[in-house]
Amino acid sequence: MKNGKTCFGVIIGTRAYFNSELAKDVRKQLLKTLDEGGYEYIILPEDATPTGSSSIETREDGLKVSKQFREHRDEIDGIIVSLPNFGFEIGIINAISDADLNVPVLVQACDDENDKVDLDSRRDAFCGKISVCNNLYQYGIPFTDTTLHTYSIYDPLLKKDIDKFAAICRVVNGLRHCRLGQIGTRPLGFNTCRASEKLLQRSGITVVPADLSEILYAAQKIKDDDPKFIEMCNRTCNYAKVPDSYKEKLGLQAKFSVAVENWIEANDVQAVAIQCWDSLEQNYGCAPCVTMSMLSEKLIPAACETDLAGAVSMYALALASKNAPALLDWNNNFAEDRNKCVCTHCGNFPKQFVGNGDLKLGPLGVLGRTLGKINTFGAVYAKVSEGPFTFFRISTDDPKGQIKAYLGKGEITNDPYGMDGCIAVTKVDNLQKLMKYICKNGFEHHVAMCRTDVVDILNEAIETYLGWNLYVHE
């Protein structure tokens, strides 16, 4: 990141015996597209090489780029290679391999025009791109392709491909440097929420643990005149409707939220998994659902039941979409419609995911019957608005020593369903096939969702760069 924006290292490839004006035009239009998209970039000065236009050809040119890229290592999120003509693979591959940034790479090449293939106008980038990609493959450098093999630098596809690539960079870099909070142990009754810290760490995901008692002690020390506490009470009331009968519980809930947010900030955590039952209700007197909902709303995904892998799944969706994700149970069949099911949770969905402002706070439903309604206040009640969604789930498979995942998309319907908590009636094509895959491959009953289509983004990020075992549901 540079100045809070996604930053690309830009390489313009060329060959001296092609018209240098082709590279000049491509440089101008590519940088214009990046500027209009709100991106930062690192590129050689126009006069840095004999071919001009910031373009590179030889190994020596490539080493100038690699030196520049290394100087901006902490800023560059991905590398964009643009080929205005055939390009020269030697300069490009030396630039990328010597820089050794370990970031995603996008390779784009320009169309020839049928009436402009004379010696002054021809590009041959169609062929040159194959050579550049062959070199990347030889060097073991993973890369992303554009929608079409070649297209005009003025084609709207360029912006779409860059925006998609930026999202891929966010996912890859975000997960490789993620600090994942764990507040409390998993619930006693949920072996299904086990996860391997060591397998997560191998992908760059560091688990940062805290005992639940630390958070409860911090919450109990917060005074009623603490500005953060007063602000949290107001934020919560503005976020969801608080019934008059539970107003006295709002303070307890708000202090827990402040303690959690303070811990997250102090430990530089990007996502968190929380032990949401039943110690918190028995030893403190509230449920953490609205805390988790409000965290997810501001893109700090918070997973229930100390589901570490679920929190990672939510974070991946947040990075890909820049939208608030939710963690749901694949919970109920929907009558005898075998492509529909009810996805629900006690009450942790963020407002953006719900898609409407009709959120109300109350006690947990099932747990409220056993732990007492007064001790389980904090659940969000909401009916999710209809529309598309992406679903995603990772799991650490210890026997196989790998991280595995599944990915797909569906529709949330407007069907009524008489259940408390957060409710989403979903429709997924070939749902029975998906359920068989989940069961046969030992996945958990939790699934992460967001309200936009980011299947292609996650597919590319995982298969090309993260190397997890991925099933994409069709």
Task: Please give the residue ranges for each predicted region.
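Cap/lid and interdomain-hinge subdomains that line or gate substrate/regulatory clefts
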Residues: 5-9, 113-231, 237-240
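Extended hydrophobic packing segments that form well-structured cores
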Residues: 28-29, 369-474
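Short beta-strand elements in bilobed, periplasmic/extracellular small-molecule ligand-binding domains
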Residues: 31-52, 142-148, 206-211
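Glycine-rich, highly charged phosphate/nucleotide-binding loops
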Residues: 54-74, 88, 252-259
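Periplasmic-binding protein-like
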Residues: 75-85, 104-108, 269-275
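Short, acidic/small-residue loops that bind anionic groups at enzyme active sites
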Residues: 94-123, 130-135, 293-306
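Long, internal scaffold/assembly segments composed of regular secondary structure
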Residues: 231-235, 239-320
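C-terminal catalytic subdomain
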Residues: 299-417
